[in-house]
Amino acid sequence: MGRVTTPSEEDSNNGLPVQQPGTPNQRTRVPVSQFAPPNYQQANVNLSVGRPWSTGLFDCQADQANAVLTTIVPCVTFGQIAEVMDEGEMTCPLGTFMYLLMMPALCSHWVMGSKYREKMRRKFNLVEAPYSDCASHVLCPCCSLCQEYRELKIRNLDPSLGWNGILAQGQGQYEREAPSFAPTNQYMSK
């Protein structure tokens, strides 16, 4: 334990207790986490939570036709992705036009691209990796669009079909899987 100081000792040292020579300097060790607010202690979580993407950001060779199309006209790929992600509310031509308009005019196509990438991540619970959504679309927009296109295609939401094509494909699959029932107008006879 520490030594008790008298008021005269504290006054001579500007109100601080005086350490007597020959006595050990005793300090109590208190964990830093005691001083941290409770929210801070819980906020230290892994931000890369979610499922991994089905393909990597730079796996453009996985769908070569889309890679070529995206390299030449990335606005078309964006329009296809936007139509599927908005469930048909934004048509492919409208999405294509908006992306095409933003590319040269404002050089801010990455804003729309990163917003739709974030929307896709949230919808499918995907991890924000290897880069943030914004960085992916600023540094390699074509690779980002290709990865998003492949992700939708792997999830049976082929952007090349458009939203109505996806619905029609789903309806056809439902009709093939529907159980067959006996005709309704059969009667028993005596």
Swiss-Prot record:
Residues 1-31 are annotated as: Disordered. The lineage of its organism: Eukaryota, Viridiplantae, Streptophyta, Embryophyta, Tracheophyta. This is Protein PLANT CADMIUM RESISTANCE 8. Belongs to the cornifelin family. Its main location: membrane. The gene is PCR8. The chain crosses the membrane at residues 94-113. It is a single-pass membrane protein. It comes from Arabidopsis thaliana (Mouse-ear cress). Residues 13-28 have a biased composition (Polar residues). Coiled coil: none annotated. It is found in: Cell membrane. Pfam families: PLAC8.
